Design a protein with these regions (language model features):
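Conserved hydrophobic residues forming the short capping helix/wall of the S-adenosyl-L-methionine
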Residues: 70, 93, 170, 200, ...
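Helix-to-beta-strand junctions that scaffold the AdoMet/dcAdoMet cofactor pocket
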Residues: 71, 129-130, 143-145
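Class I SAM-dependent methyltransferase SAM/SAH-binding core
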Residues: 51-110, 134
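Conserved alpha-helix/loop element of class I SAM-dependent methyltransferases that forms part
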Residues: 31-50, 65
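A short SAM/SAH-binding and catalytic strip from SAM-dependent methyltransferases
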Residues: 118-132, 155
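A short acidic, Gly/Pro-enriched loop at the edge of an enzyme's catalytic core
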Residues: 108-119
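Conserved catalytic/acceptor-binding region of the Class I
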Residues: 133-134, 140-141, 148-219, 238
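Conserved Class I S-adenosyl-L-methionine
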Residues: 3-4, 13, 18, 25-26, ...
Length: 284
């Protein structure tokens, strides 16, 4: 970690159990979030960008899809705090034969080459900074004048009941389950439009647009047990309980997800923000 101990909690999480889980069930998660990879890749393909930075790239799905769209002369780089996920991204890149670059680093503090990219994207990767203004100011320095910023982030927990189903169903069986802290780094840190606007404005971005989007997503039904048992606050809590409790919790949560099961898939609508902004000149 950096000497000022930035994002230590998130680094421990994503270099530990959460990172392992994402790597292990990567194909299912890729399918779950594929509509958002397509959304960002479409935006990249419609732009004139030739140097793209994917923030919080995870195992590389978005970075690789953009590289496919833009062709061999584009420079596509993914950055993530999780060494385990970056290792998986490197392996995917080798198999794909695509020309991409992955960096294990904290985008909040990493010394990016100044004015080196003309498009910055992120699929659910920018809600985890402990100082988001500092993070987006750092990304702004990496951007060339008039570079575009495009990212998707979750709207509020209230608007995303699927994402809190496990916590609500397990609450009585896991009384020590930590509550989500409003505004804290995590999935719903950017749930409020006003906060996103303030963060981007305070960090030097211009022409900010924040659009609500609702997109249908699907998870293969056989992957539901891993989704329940390994991801999110419940997944972390289940590592600390005995086998009997774990079985009871998973069974209870699976029953709570039944309304979302449609044949071979688990389906839900994701309530998100599609955010765009522009990097003004340093003199602006």
């Amino acid at each position: 970690m950096k000497q000022d101990h930035v994002n230590e909690e998130q680094s421990a999480l994503w270099n530990g159990p959460s990172g392992r889980a994402w790597v292990d069930i990567q194909p299912s998660l890729d399918r779950l979030f594929e509509p958002f990879a397509t959304l960002l890749a479409d935006a990249a393909a419609a732009s004139s960008a030739r140097a793209v930075l994917d923030v919080g790239c995870g195992t590389g799905a978005v970075t690789l899809e953009i590289a496919r769209r833009l062709g061999a002369d584009a420079q596509c780089t993914g950055v993530d705090i999780s060494a385990r996920m970056i290792d998986a991204a490197h392996e995917r890149a080798k198999r794909s034969g695509l020309r991409v670059h992955f960096v294990c680093a904290d985008a909040q503090t990493h010394a990016f080459v100044p004015a080196s990219v003309d498009l910055i994207v992120s699929r659910f990767g920018v809600m985890f900074f402990d100082d988001p203004v500092r993070a987006f100011a750092n990304l702004r320095r990496a951007a060339r004048t008039d570079a575009a910023l495009r990212f998707v982030a979750w709207r509020s927990a209230l608007e995303n009941p699927f994402m809190t189903t496990a916590e609500r169903a397990a609450a009585l069986l896991l009384p020590d389950l930590p509550p989500r802290r409003p505004g804290a780094p995590g999935q719903f840190a950017f749930g409020e439009r006003q906060r996103i606007a303030a963060v981007l404005s305070d960090s030097g971005w211009a022409d900010i647009a924040i659009e609500p989007v609702d997109i249908g997503c699907a998870l293969p039904e056989p992957a539901l047990n891993d989704y329940i048992g390994r991801l999110g606050p419940v997944g972390l809590a289940l590592q600390r309980v005995d086998d009997t409790t774990r079985r009871r919790v998973v069974e209870t949560i699976r029953n709570a997800f039944e309304p979302y099961v449609q044949g071979a898939d688990v389906r839900f609508d994701a309530a998100c923000w599609l955010v765009s902004a522009r990097a003004p000149s340093s003199a602006a």
